[in-house]
């Protein structure tokens, strides 16, 4: 009478465990990818809401904007003097959001802050919410173009009506 398992039986069990584990790894990677994408989408929405609320402060002559990094008076005065305040507005927004949101895809060699005022068109831009300023036009002080790449490739014209599936975009008028 034999006791124990043969080598072939043990190899079959190990092979079955390996196959089951591979399904688990694939599913786990899918869950991680979905969570990162959801976090990038949430970051984008939060930045758009924040910038929109700050833009509303100009008409109300609220004073301090973007956590005190700029004032509505500075923006209006610069615009009225035929200047372009949008670069300073962008810098104020990025500074105000510094440290509050992290890029779920990692630092990409740029840093862990999810909000930046530079970049676009490279794989390292994945997950970053980028704020691009546009100066005065059509009677407006300017526009903050806020866009986030949520999957590769991170290239293309994000301002296209209807947009690209992998790029979230919201323009905020000032």
Set out the residue ranges of the language-model regions.
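Periplasmic/extracellular, small/polar-rich flexible segments of pilin-like filament-forming proteins
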Residues: 56-174
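Membrane-proximal N-terminal amphipathic helix
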Residues: 33-62
């Amino acid at each position: 009478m034999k006791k124990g398992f043969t080598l072939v039986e043990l190899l079959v069990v190990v092979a079955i465990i390996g196959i089951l584990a591979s399904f688990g790894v694939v599913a786990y990677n899918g869950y991680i990818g979905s969570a990162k994408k959801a976090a990038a989408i949430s970051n984008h929405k939060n930045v758009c809401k924040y910038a929109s609320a700050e833009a509303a402060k100009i008409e109300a002559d609220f004073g301090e904007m973007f956590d005190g990094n700029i004032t509505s008076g500075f923006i209006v005065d610069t615009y009225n003097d035929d200047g372009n305040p949008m670069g300073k507005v962008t810098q104020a927004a990025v500074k105000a959001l510094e440290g509050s949101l992290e890029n779920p895809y990692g630092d990409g060699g740029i840093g862990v802050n999810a909000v930046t005022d530079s970049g676009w068109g490279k794989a390292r831009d994945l997950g970053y919410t980028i704020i691009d300023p546009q100066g005065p036009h059509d009677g407006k002080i300017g526009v903050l173009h806020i866009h986030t790449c949520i999957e590769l490739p991170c290239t293309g014209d994000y301002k296209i009506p209807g947009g690209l599936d992998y790029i979230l975009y919201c323009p905020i008028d000032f």
